Amino acid sequence: KYIXXDDVIEL
């Protein structure tokens, strides 16, 4: 999981 600001991207 990558957290960027208010964005959460699950890889």
UniProtKB/Swiss-Prot annotation:
* Superkingdom to which the source organism belongs: Eukaryota
Q: What else is known?
A: On the 2D-gel the determined pI of this unknown protein is: 5.5, its MW is: 48 kDa.
Q: Could you tell me what this protein is called?
A: Unknown protein from 2D-PAGE of fibroblasts
